[in-house]
Amino acid sequence: MSGFRSVGRNGLQSADFRIPFQNGDESSAISSPSSGFATYSGGDVARRGAGGRPEAKLRAAVLGATGIVGQRFVRRLASHPDFELVALAASGRSAGKRYRDACSWHLDGDAYAGFGDMIVQACSPEAFEADLVFSALDSEPAREIEPAFAASGSVVFSNASAFRMEEDVPLLIPELNSAHLGILERQRAERGWKGAIVTNPNCTTVVLASALAPLERAFGIEAVMMTSMQAISGAGYPGVSAMDISGNVIPYIRNEEPKVESEAGKILGCLRGLGVEARQEAAAFPLSATCTRVPVVEGHTLTVSVRLRGSPSVAQVEDAFRGFIPDTAGLGLHSAPERFLVLSDSPDRPQPKRDVEADGGMRITLGRVRPCPVMGIKFIALGHNTERGAAGASVLNAELAYAKEVLRWVR
């Protein structure tokens, strides 16, 4: 059985790992970049083609394809080099209809991303076959539907909150905690699944954890206080009523604050043990979150105050931000931003209007690092809530698993 490279404080160092087949056939394990990938329908091997890409693509499906996040999944997968979109699925009222008849397209660019005539399927593994399933379902239906796909052999990359805090489910930001994919062997063994579930965090947590990771790695975190100013797109379409949000700030988003406070610690924690003995250990610092809704279309802006070990200076914190090397460096992941964290020198940045679309919406932009008389350091962080915080995050998770050769056991 293959193991992991040792991890640093709270598991934030990048890791090399392989997950063996469930039957323990170590001879089938793949350990080098030149090795093949398991096929997607029958056990033969699809070898890498020119440029290191495999000659066959993994079959992908989108659950909840008619919603705003589902549409972003469709647009991202439309021309993906490694994944082929073969099925769109939604609720019973949409199943059986052409995609263009099941929903209105709410994104820029080509309407329905070329899939307008595809027939929408039911959210059931009996309705279609897919190697990868990208879930934009709400949490309640996700709790029943996602395990059905995982049990049948699909790998589910979920934007839903249903399984994020489960002990055997990775809550992944590829740049920060790629080693957490190692929990999948335990997940599959204990649940008896042929496939698996991998989750991405809440859209606010993605921004916060990405900003905190360099500080945890460089200094260690003692406490965090955060206030979010969250875009209306985070409420879905049609979202918050214009009568409620225009010229207003709504100081409450249901269930948002507990999600942020619990998820960040899991992401910044570490994976202990190997194989079926692996367990996730959360980072042990207190985090207080206040989440608000503001009249911005896209982009969550956070004000963050943090107490760090050793009381580093502003210059040292800025150096930690600028010097952060993500786990994904050198992997060539299709959806990875050219620059994951960018620290702005402008006193009035980041701004959603000017910064949120950077690197296809996958960049986290930081700014205004300064002393905090209460906590020690404070700064601003910004990220795209429906790309970096939703569809783009799940697709990037799948690309990481693919690059790390974790997807060898898909059917």
Regions found by a protein language model. Name each.
Residues 2-252, 282-286, 358, 364-365, ...:
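N-terminal Rossmann-like NAD(P) cofactor-binding subdomain of oxidoreductases
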Residues 232-411:
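Charged docking surfaces used in two-component/phosphorelay signaling
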